[in-house]
Amino acid sequence: MQYQYINSYSLLAAGGLFDFDATLSFIALEFLLLTSVLNLIYYQPISKVIDSREDYIRENLNKASLYLDQANELTKKYELELITARKEAIKMVTTSQTEAQEFVNAQISQAQKEAQQLIQSSMMQFEKEKNKAIYSLEKQVEQLSEQIKNKLISIYI
């Protein structure tokens, strides 16, 4: 293989690297044409796809944010309803316990009254029976006394 060395002096002598002839303008025109073709074929569709994806993502983020706000509102609403329901349940339980205690107290009071009446009735019945027995015994004592007296009188007479 043969190597050819470029003589740097020969490039500089005839205008060299900075020779402004038709080639430079053709390359510039070619660059502009390639840029516009790439812009039409490649960059615009890609930028449209990227923009549409950004819009899609933005819409989804907005929807997600809206759904999150709605979910938070519903959560707060249901938590308040739950707190209210718990308070009502506690109130109902307390009321039921109070009513049950009042009912039990009323039943106990009624049973005590009935027991007291039964005791009084029994005491009155017992008192009547006692008085009857005493009266009967007094009569028998009188009769026995009379008999003893009569026997004693008959013995002494």
Curated annotation (Swiss-Prot):
The major lineage groups are: Eukaryota, Rhodophyta, Bangiophyceae, Galdieriales, Galdieriaceae
> InterPro entries, per this entry?
ATP_synth_b (IPR034679), ATP_synth_b/b'su_bac/chlpt (IPR002146), ATP_synthase_B_chain (IPR050059)
Which terms in the GO cellular component ontology are assigned? chloroplast thylakoid membrane; proton-transporting ATP synthase complex
Give the source species.
Answer: Galdieria sulphuraria (Red alga)
Bilayer disposition of the protein? Single-pass membrane protein
The gene designation is atpF2
Q: Where are the transmembrane segments?
A: 20-42
Molecular function as annotated in GO: ATP binding; proton-transporting ATP synthase activity, rotational mechanism; proton-transporting ATPase activity, rotational mechanism
Family the entry assigns: Belongs to the ATPase B chain family.
Compartments in which it is found:
Plastid, Chloroplast thylakoid membrane
Keyword tags: ATP synthesis, ATP-binding, CF(0), Chloroplast, Hydrogen ion transport, Ion transport, Membrane, Nucleotide-binding, Plastid, Thylakoid, Transmembrane, Transmembrane helix, Transport
Describe its function. Answer: F(1)F(0) ATP synthase produces ATP from ADP in the presence of a proton or sodium gradient. F-type ATPases consist of two structural domains, F(1) containing the extramembraneous catalytic core and F(0) containing the membrane proton channel, linked together by a central stalk and a peripheral stalk. During catalysis, ATP synthesis in the catalytic domain of F(1) is coupled via a rotary mechanism of the central stalk subunits to proton translocation.
The answer to keyword Chloroplast applying to this record is: yes
Further remark, if any?
A: In plastids the F-type ATPase is also known as CF(1)CF(0).
Specify whether Thylakoid is a keyword of the entry. Answer: yes
Name this polypeptide is given: ATP synthase subunit b', chloroplastic
Q: How does it assemble?
A: F-type ATPases have 2 components, F(1) - the catalytic core - and F(0) - the membrane proton channel. F(1) has five subunits: alpha(3), beta(3), gamma(1), delta(1), epsilon(1). F(0) has four main subunits: a(1), b(1), b'(1) and c(10-14). The alpha and beta chains form an alternating ring which encloses part of the gamma chain. F(1) is attached to F(0) by a central stalk formed by the gamma and epsilon chains, while a peripheral stalk is formed by the delta, b and b' chains.
